[in-house]
Amino acid sequence: MTLNKKTNNENSSKTTPKLSKKTDFQNDFASKNYVFNPQDKVFQIAQVFGITSAVLIKKLLQLGLKADVNQTLEKDIVELLAKEYNIKVIEPQKEQTPPQLQPQKPPLTKSKLQAKPNQKLNLQKTPPIVTIMGHVDHGKTTLLDAIRKTRVVDQEFGGITQHIGAYQVEYQGNKITFIDTPGHEAFDKMRARGAKITDICILVVAVDDCVKPQTLEALKHAQKAQIPIIVALNKVDKPNNKTQQIMQELSSYDLLPEEWGGTTPYIAISALKREGLEKILEIILLFSEIQNLQTNPDQKAKGTVIEASLDKSLGPVATFIISDGNLKVGDIVVAGTSYGKIRSMEDENKKTPTKALPSQPVRVSGLKEVPQAGDIFYAVSNEKQARQIVSEKKTKTKETLAKPPSPLNLEDILQDLETEKPQELNIILKADTQGSLEALQGMIDKIKVSDLKVQLLRAAVGTITEKDIAFAKSSDSLLIGFNIKPAFSTLKSAQIQEVKITIHNVIYRIIEDIEQKLKSMIKPTFEEVVTGKVEVRKIFNISKVGNIAGCYVTQGIVNNSDFAKVMRNDEVLFKGKITSLKHLKDNIKSAKQGHECGILLDGFNDFEINDIIETSKLSKVEE
């Protein structure tokens, strides 16, 4: 590859090529001209353009072309791409033999993943916290089970394992914390509350399937949190392997594989056969070392609530993950708008430590109320201080809710209705057998009601548990059971926490319930309907109230609940809400054509004689 450089004098009046906003680096040798070489590969052309291979592959996908970093491109395609970066593609001179650029695989360095320096004293190495995410049936739980080397699914109903939403494993003398959060919604709620809850994300994709919407949703949340991502290509032991297709698609979302010149590790695994797990654990430790995760274990505890529920024996219980400091039995903590004295702590093995260190998950009791998943908790000096903090938080919440709404504008309301995001119905599904579960999943995937979406956050065999209720509460999900009988205590807990459980023994009844729920979520469509028109004939100034327009109704009917548009010489001066409609001194509901009335508007006083006020309302459009 040869670049035809020009001297500074020749280029002084010309601008340099415009580069993509997503460029990770700019090569010093990127110039106005590029000498085309048919042997140049995608990653080499990207270097010339001053962009990453991932950006160039994404551009090619937008053109409908699939390529990897080692693929060559036709000249017309290169010319099309070069135009965007103000680069001219020229033919090489016959006597020239363009030298080839050597592949430059970007190493995984601290510059990519460097954590902010911690200025606290007595900093010590902290175990990484890892979240496993992905589509509901691509093997997240199986991978967690395999890493933990216990059958969590089998022991959920009466075994010795204590489900606290997170657990630790040890590998090569290093501890790693895994969060057992089977849905990205709860993860996103934690991030939305300001919790840096996880250090690394494992994105699980089944190679016998493909990239699903829930896969991309999970990816989006991980990228928002700005954490390293490891792609686990699961079920490699099965036929119909679509690894290349998956890598190609995820590359367009800035997950360029290391073997293609990117920085994202793609690990082939079989969670069921426990193959490839050591490689994942090695990369987790590598990412942890690069991020230089450190905290001060000697200070007061701070961390995040992972799960919370109401236990019939212990009262409010919550799973804490400590992000800084240490938590001890007897500490006073504030968690969201709850507080209390830690009475007991348990880990996932039902051991009862008296102290929990950074990245350690523990299930605690002693809080006055059930906090929410994602709430920040921290230890305070005494109960009086905790009460004061919680009281102030609750007061601020009430003040926020009590704030008067801003002046209404009909066009703004219509725009809000039009741009409102499609609603989603979150579902947690439990069934008696794997066959029933798969049949229900297939039927639920086919449900279509308007533009509403069904998100199946969890699907598993077995009865409904306290863990399901806690997850349904935190993710605002509908909990559905097929051919199962939950324990009375579980149903009672769901009632206390206001979690709706639906149990059926006939599959189509479940589908009907879901469709009915979706139909109830459909928001009506509205349109603006003009109700009347008035002419301003007098202006009355009322102290402490403002100007009232004395009007004559020339068309239709004016109602006291209408919106108003003030016009002068065909120019719209104001759009807003009618505050008051009067006849003489009396408040009236409406004024008909040929009648007089007084109009007071919310936010407008500058009336002039002969102004026109057009009134309108929102009318529901029948489907």
Swiss-Prot record:
The keyword Protein biosynthesis is assigned to this record: yes
Residues binding GTP: 134-141, 180-184, 234-237
Signal peptide: none
Segments of this protein annotated with the region G1: 134-141
Biased composition (Low complexity): 1-18
Keyword match Protein biosynthesis: yes
Annotated region described as G4, given as residue ranges: 234-237
Annotated S-S bridges: none
Taxonomic superkingdom: Bacteria
Gene Ontology MF terms in the entry: GTP binding; GTPase activity; translation initiation factor activity
Region (G3): 180-183
Keywords: Cytoplasm, GTP-binding, Initiation factor, Nucleotide-binding, Protein biosynthesis
Record-linked Pfam families: EF-G_D2, GTP_EFTU, IF-2, IF2_N
SUPFAM superfamilies linked: Initiation factor IF2/eIF5b, domain 3 (SSF52156), P-loop containing nucleoside triphosphate hydrolases (SSF52540), Translation proteins (SSF50447)
Locations listed in the record: Cytoplasm
Region described as G2: 159-163
Annotated stretches, region: Disordered: 1-21, 92-115
CDD domains: IF2_eIF5B, IF2_mtIF2_II, mtIF2_IVc
Chain intervals for the UniProt region annotation (G5): 270-272
The tr-type G domain, residue ranges: 125-293
Known function: One of the essential components for the initiation of protein synthesis. Protects formylmethionyl-tRNA from spontaneous hydrolysis and promotes its binding to the 30S ribosomal subunits. Also involved in the hydrolysis of GTP during the formation of the 70S ribosomal complex.
PANTHER family (alphabetical): TR-TYPE G DOMAIN-CONTAINING PROTEIN (PTHR43381:SF5), TRANSLATION INITIATION FACTOR IF-2-RELATED (PTHR43381)
Family per similarity comment: Belongs to the TRAFAC class translation factor GTPase superfamily. Classic translation factor GTPase family. IF-2 subfamily.
Protein name: Translation initiation factor IF-2
Originating species: Aster yellows witches'-broom phytoplasma (strain AYWB)
